[in-house]
């Protein structure tokens, strides 16, 4: 009797499932309920629906992959639109997004220099100079080594930072520290921790590194960079910079998107008809689904393009929000983040994180140089040599400083002279002294350049001489 009753119950359950599938309108099934007596819906929670033993075994074996899951979502949303009279259409209401626009390139952080210097004096103990926070790193593994060191240096972050490169001579009087920060910036922007096109990057979601609090320690490093001769981390897109500085999005810039995706969306926006927009949408529907934009092809219109753009741009935050928040938490080491978020500091602080900082110009770089000409007979020879070097600086704006396909830029000259490709957030402690002698050499710690006196060198030869000298130096790296 018991066996017969179980068999009858099984048949009844199977009949109920068939009834829902065959008789209930598809839009009702997709919404998660079926019609009961009268007009009241009876909720059917899918997770508690009865499953036969064979069905359970099948589910345990056939776990759908990401593509299948995406297809199931697409099928469900498509089902909502099979009936054109359906009142639950997804495109009945299209929410507004943040305004689209362009904040423009960010100016330098010159306005923050004095504020940051004062802040450093409050938190970095000058009395600890004999026992600094020593980071001894391998030149080719700056990022890995520095994160390893800072994980175990939480109690030593108030000490002045001192850098030593393994197997290299040199005492850090400022130059090695600036060089370290430049190498760290380069390493981070080319690491597995970030994604996106250069100058428009965001963090890459990374479960293991998040659990290890790596992004928190990255934030700590950048906080130290900002107040100890570094440039910050100017690599992020506009929307990520907004989030770091303001905690929210103010303007959405399509230029934050990868070029291919940006072009596809522009083509969609400029479509002559909804039909053409649907066709363009079909080529990116899978990645749209991955970021949570669920609209079936049959329902897509040109009105959906702006929200779709916004969804892709905002995913630069939503896809890695935990990593970003962890980074921001680390940035508040020595209350640096709190300082930068003060209303009067926010505009200048953008340049410490935005990948759109205006590059230094030859004119501004020239103002960093202080030529020290001798009196008497040597004066004219030194001035002629100085003119040759200034001609070389001007030539970096064109193709004259290219050798064998390798292009030397002004930032490379700055790295050679100062150890930094970007002016530090707190600025340089002095101008770069330019002296003259029998050979050319630099002292990045002292911010001093000595030029070989060569009054008879032609302009063309001067450009070639300094170009070859810097390209063959230890500080030059070709991306």
Predicted regions and their residues:
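Short coil/turn segments at secondary-structure boundaries
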Residues: 14, 148, 175-178, 199, ...
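Eukaryotic short linear interaction motifs
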Residues: 7-10, 26-27, 72, 170-173, ...
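Hydrophobic, conserved cores of late-appearing folded domains
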Residues: 86-227, 232-236, 248-253
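Long, low-complexity intrinsically disordered regions
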Residues: 65-68, 236, 255
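Extended amphipathic alpha-helical scaffold segments
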Residues: 1, 168, 172-173, 219-239, ...
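C-terminal catalytic/scaffold cores in eukaryotic proteins
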Residues: 122-145, 240-479
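Phospho-regulated scaffold assembly regions enriched in serine/threonine/proline and acidic residues
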Residues: 1-110, 115-122, 213-214, 462-465, ...
């Amino acid at each position: 009797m018991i066996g017969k009753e179980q068999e009858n119950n099984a048949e009844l359950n199977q009949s109920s499932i068939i009834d829902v599938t065959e008789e209930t309108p598809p839009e009702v099934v997709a919404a998660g309920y079926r019609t009961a007596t009268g007009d009241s819906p009876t909720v059917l929670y899918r997770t508690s629906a009865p499953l036969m033993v064979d069905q359970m075994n099948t589910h345990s074996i056939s776990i759908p992959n990401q593509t299948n899951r995406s297809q199931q979502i697409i099928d469900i949303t498509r089902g909502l639109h099979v009936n054109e009279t359906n009142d639950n259409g997804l495109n009945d209401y299209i929410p507004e997004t943040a305004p689209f626009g362009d904040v423009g390139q960010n100016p330098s952080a010159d306005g923050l220099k004095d504020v940051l210097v004062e802040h450093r004096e409050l938190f970095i103990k000058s009395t600890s100079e004999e026992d600094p926070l020593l980071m001894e790193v391998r030149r080719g593994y700056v990022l890995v080594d520095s994160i390893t060191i800072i994980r175990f240096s939480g109690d030593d972050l108030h000490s002045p930072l001192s850098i030593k490169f393994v197997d290299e001579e040199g005492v850090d009087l400022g130059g090695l520290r600036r060089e370290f920060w430049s190498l760290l910036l380069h390493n981070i922007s080319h690491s597995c921790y970030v994604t996106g096109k250069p100058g428009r990057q965001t963090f890459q979601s990374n479960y293991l590194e998040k659990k290890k609090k790596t992004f928190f320690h990255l934030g700590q490093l950048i906080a130290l960079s900002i107040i100890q001769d570094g440039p910050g981390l100017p690599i992020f897109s506009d929307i990520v910079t907004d989030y770091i500085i303001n905690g929210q999005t103010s303007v959405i810039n399509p230029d934050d998107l990868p070029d291919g995706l940006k072009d596809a969306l522009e083509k969609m926006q400029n479509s002559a008809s909804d039909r053409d927009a649907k066709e363009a949408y079909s080529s990116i529907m899978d990645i749209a689904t991955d970021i949570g934009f669920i609209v079936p092809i049959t329902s897509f219109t040109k009105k959906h393009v702006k929200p779709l753009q916004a969804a892709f741009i905002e995913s630069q935050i939503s896809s890695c929000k935990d990593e970003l928040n962890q980074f921001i938490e680390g940035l508040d080491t020595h209350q640096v983040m709190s300082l930068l978020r003060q209303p009067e500091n926010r505009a200048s602080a953008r340049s410490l994180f935005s990948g759109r900082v205006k590059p230094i110009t030859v004119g501004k770089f020239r103002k960093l140089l202080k030529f020290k000409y001798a009196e008497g007979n040597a004066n004219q020879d030194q001035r002629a040599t100085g003119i040759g070097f200034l001609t070389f600086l001007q030539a970096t704006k064109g193709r004259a400083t290219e050798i064998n396909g390798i292009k030397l830029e002004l930032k490379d000259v700055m790295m050679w002279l100062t150890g930094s490709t970007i002016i530090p957030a707190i600025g340089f402690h002095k101008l770069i002294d330019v002296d003259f002698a029998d050979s050319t050499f630099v002292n990045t710690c002292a911010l001093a350049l000595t030029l070989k006196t060569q009054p008879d060198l032609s302009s063309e030869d001067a450009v070639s001489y300094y170009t070859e000298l810097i390209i063959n130096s230890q500080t030059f790296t070709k991306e």
